[in-house]
A protein has these predicted regions:
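RNase III-family endoribonuclease catalytic core
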Residues: 34-145, 154
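Pyridoxal 5′-phosphate
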Residues: 163-167
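Short, Lys/Arg-enriched N-terminal segments with co-localized hydrophobic residues
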Residues: 21-34
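C-terminal edge-of-domain segments
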Residues: 174-191
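Active-site phosphate/pyrophosphate- and oxyanion-stabilizing loops and adjacent acidic/basic residues
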Residues: 148
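Short acidic capping loops at alpha-helix termini that bridge into adjacent secondary structure
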Residues: 157-160
Length: 191
């Protein structure tokens, strides 16, 4: 089979400045983007007589998260999103649940350490978005406090922090009130 070459194409185009799909081209080298996106997810079972801490805020509840740390699903998902954006691993790698040093630890301490690590690697947090799936208790009364607490720990304006809560319409383990999950997206810039 005959392949059309540059000479054939140029002869057809006769000097036209229009793009010719047959003309060979060299791939342009793309600059590495300074903006990076990360995604995080976390889930914990719920049990009686444990504290429920979400987004750095203790939420009044008869049930709380079963976890090695304080079980803050929102912060754990956020840490994974931030670490993922910078390709720095995940929360389990940095703070393994096999290490007694992290037993019962306040997750805002973990988030602070993640933010410091990002800074050391030359990243700045642009914005974060978190969705928490929990049937009960309702989180709406606590959202603004969560946003403020997370912004404080990360050292960014509260307007760069979005926290949303949803039920799962009684579907899945969240709907059956067996557990809570959180999803997070983070945008960071390499400065």
């Amino acid at each position: 089979m005959y392949r059309r070459g540059k000479k054939d194409c140029l002869a057809e185009c006769k000097g036209s400045k229009l793009f010719c799909k047959f003309a060979p081209s060299r791939p342009k080298r793309q600059k590495e983007s300074r903006m990076r996106v990360g995604f995080g997810y976390d889930v914990h079972a719920l049990a009686e007589d444990l504290r429920l801490v979400i987004g750095g805020v203790e939420v009044p509840s008869q049930r709380g998260c079963v976890a090695h740390s304080d079980g803050d699903v929102a912060i754990h998902a956020l840490c994974d999103a931030l670490l993922g954006a910078a390709a720095l691993g995940d929360i389990g790698k940095l703070f393994p649940d096999t290490d007694a040093a992290y037993k019962g630890i306040d997750s805002t301490i973990l988030l602070d350490r993640v933010c410091k690590r990002l800074g050391e690697e030359g990243y700045r947090i642009e914005n974060v978005d978190i969705t928490i799936a929990l049937q009960r208790p309702k989180l709406r009364p606590h959202i603004d406090l969560m946003r403020a607490r997370l912004a404080e720990v990360m050292g960014i304006e509260v307007g760069r922090v979005s926290v949303k809560a949803t039920t799962t319409e009684r579907l899945g383990f969240e709907g059956r009130e067996e557990g809570v999950s959180a999803y997070a997206v983070a945008l960071v810039e390499n400065i």
